[in-house]
Amino acid sequence: MEAGQQWPGKTDFYLQLPKVELHAHLNGSISSSTMKKLIAKKPHLNVHGHMTMIDKGKKRTLQECFQMFQVIHQLTTSAEDILMVTKDVIKEFADDGVKYLELRSTPREENATGMTRKTYVESVLEGIKQCKQENLDIDVRYLMAIDRRGGPTIARETVELAKEFFLSTENTVLGLDLSGDPTIGQANDFLEPLLEAKKAGLKLALHLAEIPNREKENQMLLSLLPDRIGHGTFLSASEAGALDQVDFVRQHQIPLELCLTSNIKSQTVPSYDQHHFGFWYSIAHPSVICTDDKGVFATYLSQEYQLAAETFNLTPFQVWDLSYESINYIFACDNTRSELRKRWTHLKQKVLNCNEVNYF
């Protein structure tokens, strides 16, 4: 079964389903329409669509995926670019029925345009603010990402930025993400800044166990007791030490952000039916369906829910509960959770009635 395959009559249910998106990288979420605008602004780069998106039925290695992000970064080099991208991405998630979104992105500096890490962050926040002023039906927050390639020095600078904006943005900046090429850098380099962030009250969403044979690193990052885990693909593998990590994650009920199409197209998981969502869902572990990079992987959250439901034979009520329970794992405050639950409850009958007409 390929991502993008349509099931006639069922699509409305997944689109109308209210959803929470907790693992979405800003630059990886740029749609083809926004990408065309960026490419038109920089024709000298000679970038084409296939260099920034993996089409239906195609796959790349994880390393090739990270190379694609380098191409995308060449297109988003100014504060104006970041503002436009942020607004477009938010609007597209809203159009897909996402009611709460935590966007993550690494603050970057670009000497050629004068963009600093701080103005990068300010551009993301301005995009969030403008979408709110336009009364879009979506609540958006921001997680600052530490890219492993930057090393410990830039990690510390990012933590300082996050602390500054955490205090000044009225709960818009909520936490930190550790991401980037998992083969670069040592986890030990990031423990101190991440711990400092945690002490300051910032939440931690850490990419963890994306690739095999990283038991020692996984243990180090788990020692921080992250608030959520991104991917966790090889936590459930039967390699030495991995079983202990599964038990640790289960005992501490650390929610997992699971991105099916991303893992298939980057070839860290061989097929949808072998995706580790099946294992974690079967033991009722806190799990959230996410897109990761909806632009690069040519997907959207409604489609990811549909893929999970079709692959693992979930009933419409199980799909609803999966979405509803994801509210528990957001980084915003209890009041926000309460408001979201009210919205879900208000929409429930309408969405499930739509399902009764179209699903079977």
Swiss-Prot record:
Binding of N(6)-methyl-AMP, residues: H25, N27, H73, S105, T106, P107, R108, D147, G180, E210, D292, D293
Coiled coil: none
Catalytic residues identified in the record: E210 (proton donor)
GO biological process, one term: nucleotide metabolic process
Enzyme class: hydrolase
InterPro entries assigned: A_deaminase_dom, Ado/ade_deaminase, Metal_Hydrolase
Family: Belongs to the metallo-dependent hydrolases superfamily. Adenosine and AMP deaminases family.
Protein name from the UniProt record: N6-Methyl-AMP deaminase
Organism whose genome encodes this protein: Mus musculus
